[in-house]
């Protein structure tokens, strides 16, 4: 089980019926920036055999910031009865946000390729303060720079957030290319390589 001295700083609040791939990308990139133990993502962070409901609410309490990740289906997702999940008092997304408010956590709405911020009149009364919180948008065509911008802002806002400037993916490496021309060596910029890379003479 997780120790009392948890490293969790960022809690990802998201709806599984919404943009699951988007939130997985967000977790991957923020984990690369700050370390995987720093970011709580339920499908990654809850240990086998753990009480998953207690684990989620404990993680909200331990975190410094709760990112409310909103895709295009976040607000309109419905349950088996055809009612909006966000209106259900037992909805976990709703309960996590309300707990974050109750505990005075920094709550940051993150829009995944959603052009407009959520409106107060579209939210249940208990969550309407989400509409006045400063949010950040992650665009489909600008996801990389947008997530980098989010990470930079989080680093400014959250005390003690670990800094990890380089990607940690085992499948990514860097090399520096040199060219020899007339005895002169020219050094080029670093390049990230995914998969196998062979450096050597070319034979036909």
Mark where each language-model region is:
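Conserved N-terminal substructure of TIR/SEFIR domains
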Residues: 1-73, 89, 101-103, 145, ...
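Short amphipathic alpha-helical segments
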Residues: 23-25, 78-82, 121-123
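Conserved TIR/SEFIR loop-to-helix hotspot centered on a Trp-containing motif
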Residues: 51, 72-105, 115-117
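Glycine-rich, charge-decorated loop segments at or immediately adjacent to ligand/cofactor-binding or catalytic sites
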Residues: 116-127
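C-terminal helix of von Willebrand factor
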Residues: 139-158
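Long, low-complexity intrinsically disordered regions enriched in small/polar
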Residues: 164-204
């Amino acid at each position: 089980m997780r120790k009392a001295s948890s490293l969790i700083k960022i809690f990802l609040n998201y709806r599984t019926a919404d943009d699951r791939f988007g939130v997985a990308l967000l977790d991957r990139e923020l984990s690369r920036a700050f370390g995987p133990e720093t970011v709580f993502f339920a499908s990654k962070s809850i240990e086998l055999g753990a009480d998953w409901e207690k684990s989620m609410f404990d993680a909200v309490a331990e975190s410094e910031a709760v990112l409310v990740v909103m895709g295009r289906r976040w607000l309109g997702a419905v349950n088996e009865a055809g009612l909006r999940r966000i209106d259900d008092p037992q909805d976990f997304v709703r309960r996590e946000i309300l707990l974050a408010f109750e505990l005075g956590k920094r709550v940051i709405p993150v829009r995944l390729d959603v052009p407009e911020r959520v409106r107060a009149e579209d939210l249940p009364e208990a969550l309407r303060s989400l509409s006045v919180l400063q949010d950040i948008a992650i665009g489909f065509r600008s996801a990389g720079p947008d997530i980098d911008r989010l990470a930079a802002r989080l680093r400014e806002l959250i005390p003690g957030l670990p800094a990890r400037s380089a990607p940690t993916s085992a499948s990514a490496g860097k090399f520096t290319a040199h060219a020899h021309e007339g005895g002169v060596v020219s050094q080029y910029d670093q390049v990230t390589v995914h998969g196998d890379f062979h450096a050597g003479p070319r034979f036909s």
